[in-house]
Amino acid sequence: MPFGQNVQRLRRAAGLSQEELAERLGVTRQAVSKWERDSAYPEMEKLARMSQLFGVTVEALLNGDPAP
């Protein structure tokens, strides 16, 4: 599963909007939108924070492992 699709799936499973995820990560909603479209990628710090927020490893976040 592509990275962006995985981020979107995990975000929705967590019940978060793009805006809410952006606020928790300290980025703009546009940044989250770009990540989900695979037109940009987050910094390692943001990947680590997302993995904590979603309860998955960074590897699972990057590789699109199906189980959160």
Show where each model-derived region lies.
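A detector for short, charged/polar N-terminal pre-domain segments
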Residues: M1-P2
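Short basic helix-loop element that most often maps to the first helix and adjoining turn
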Residues: Q5-R24
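Conserved hydrophobic/aromatic packing and binding residues within compact polymer-binding modules
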Residues: V7, L21-A22, V32-W35, L61
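Key DNA-contact positions within bacterial/archaeal DNA-binding proteins
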Residues: E19, Q30, A40, E59
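DNA major-groove recognition helix of helix-turn-helix/homeodomain DNA-binding modules
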Residues: E45-A60
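Short, charged recognition helix plus adjacent turn
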Residues: G64-P68
